[in-house]
């Protein structure tokens, strides 16, 4: 059985103190999980300042006593004041997926706009999976795309993804891929785009059900982007893409009201989950993205009251349309 946990360091102190605190928590957590028959299979670290923190984190992980599972590191400052927060996945079964957190070196990224950086990252992924006999269309189940200065650079990413998907045989007549496209950064100063790819090498197309919720959300291709709202796998596990306050016409709802947007996006997520045979009560964790850090106390209090037992992390990250003040993603189990 999968177990999702969000871990935070003790409050206060410099980054090196926060890192020591968090890694101690991770060691204790993995030891407790091992006693329940689960082992670590995935970690994502959210940093407040990747350029000053990522190298120290990577060095610390080299000496970490537990085998480091699939790993992602992104700058999306946690809004509870933590300098670093971790999302951990442990499982009683061996990992049945491949995870590639692809980044560009300074030399690769320098001088390239977001379109060309995105094309290069997709090409890197294709160069990895093709020798394994895998395809983007069938075996890539989920992506997370992080865009620095998303208000400026999102359009280039969208065009690149559309072009790659067309070349690889993905369209609105077949399917796209569940995804989050969100503001985020890496330690690379020239890198404007970074992509995490989740791949299931043994999956069949018939084992994926794409969730639409057309009563609440428009098809993404209606407004020129290419991703699925969510996907349900054969075992009932559901990945919900980054979801905002949108209606069936593709319009932003409740401009300027972050709580009304939160309620609407959760209504959208609930409708997607119901289509996949699940519900908000079966969500395993939430990742919450806020455009304006001033909204954190209001949103965090609302989520605590509505989902007091569901792990969550609330991050500073701008959504792809400026009018969207909040976006959320999650994973869920079947009823």
Question: Which role fits each region the language model picked out?
Answer:
Residues 1-284, 289-335:
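N-terminal presequence-like segments and the immediate start of the first folded domain
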